[in-house]
Regions:
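Walker A/P-loop NTP-binding active-site region of P-loop NTPases
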Residues: 2-57
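Conserved beta-strand segments of the P-loop GTPase G domain that flank and frequently precede/overlap
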Residues: 37-38, 74-75, 106-112, 135-140
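Switch II (G3) loop of P-loop NTPases
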Residues: 71-90
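Inter-motif core of Ras-like GTPase G domains
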Residues: 86-114
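Conserved C-terminal guanine-recognition region of P-loop GTPase G domains, centered on the G4
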Residues: 94-95, 99, 115-131
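Short glycine-/polar-rich loops that comprise or flank the Walker A/P-loop
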Residues: 101-106, 130-133, 163
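Beta-strand-loop-alpha "switch" segments that mediate conformational coupling across diverse proteins
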Residues: 142-207
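NTP-binding/hydrolysis catalytic cores, primarily Walker-type P-loop NTPases
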Residues: 179-244
Length: 244
């Protein structure tokens, strides 16, 4: 079995890249081969990525080959590109092609108490529900236009789908301030820890471990079935054992 994970919400600053960085670390500690995919040249991540351009389109076999040669492929669909990626995906019947190579699809939707974010997540769920497992992740973010997630039309729709719902903890304000002081944000800090002080690295690791413990609840939807283990791997930076 293989797994394609798509992180999608066409609203800006809703936690997509933070989830990408977290999931990448989660999968890596499982000892699985993975590929990170971006859908726009404007996305800049300080790690190796593959570009599948959502706006201009990409050869369908590119995605199939990536999945076929790698246990897990994580797609960070850029803001404004999720719908383009979806149209290209279904127009080329990639759901059928992935099914032929025994690849499961999981779509992860970041949400917060914001009108636009919730609306976009609901729209993405409507599209992907027919071929993918849906995981909704509540992010600790401020809203531009507040709408309580609990009891919202989006939350009711996710419940009807039977989507898994997770809530990630917030990063401490003092740690966010330290990260911003070196011109980073949370996802970049997760991927470029060498720029952080030891104290901030330690606090960020503690937050990451807590977040990954929550992600473990969705492990059946994230990790390919034949690769699920409870192995313990060493953290390369701190030399600490993280049992996932």
């Amino acid at each position: 079995m293989k797994k394609l994970i798509i992180i999608a919400n066409d609203t800006d600053a809703c936690g997509k890249t933070t989830l990408t960085a977290l999931l990448s670390g989660f999968v890596q500690r499982k000892g699985l081969r993975q590929t990170l995919v971006v859908t726009s040249q404007e996305q800049e991540l300080p790690v190796d990525t593959v570009l599948l351009d959502a706006e201009d389109g990409f050869a369908p076999e590119e995605l199939v080959d990536l999945v076929d040669h790698c246990g897990v492929v994580i797609v960070d669909a850029h803001t404004g590109g999720a719908e383009d990626f979806e149209k290209h995906f279904f127009r080329n019947r990639l759901d059928e092609a992935l099914d032929e190579i025994e690849c499961g699809v999981t779509v992860i939707l970041p949400v917060c108490d914001d009108v636009a974010v919730l609306h976009q997540a609901q729209e993405r769920a409507r599209v992907w529900n027919k071929c993918a497992e849906v995981v909704v992740v509540r992010m600790p973010l401020l809203a531009d236009e507040h709408q309580e997630y609990k009891g919202s039309p989006a939350q009711r729709y996710f419940s009807q789908l039977g989507a898994m719902e997770l809530t990630l903890p917030a990063v401490k304000d003092c740690i966010l301030d330290e990260i911003e002081a070196v011109d980073l944000d949370v996802p970049l800090a997760l991927l470029q820890r060498q720029h952080l002080t030891r104290f901030v690295r330690t606090e960020l690791l503690a937050w990451e471990v807590s977040a990954c413990e929550i992600l473990r609840n969705a492990e059946d939807l994230i990790i390919p079935a034949n690769s699920r283990t409870s192995d313990t791997r060493d953290d390369a930076i701190f030399g600490k054992s993280l049992a996932f």
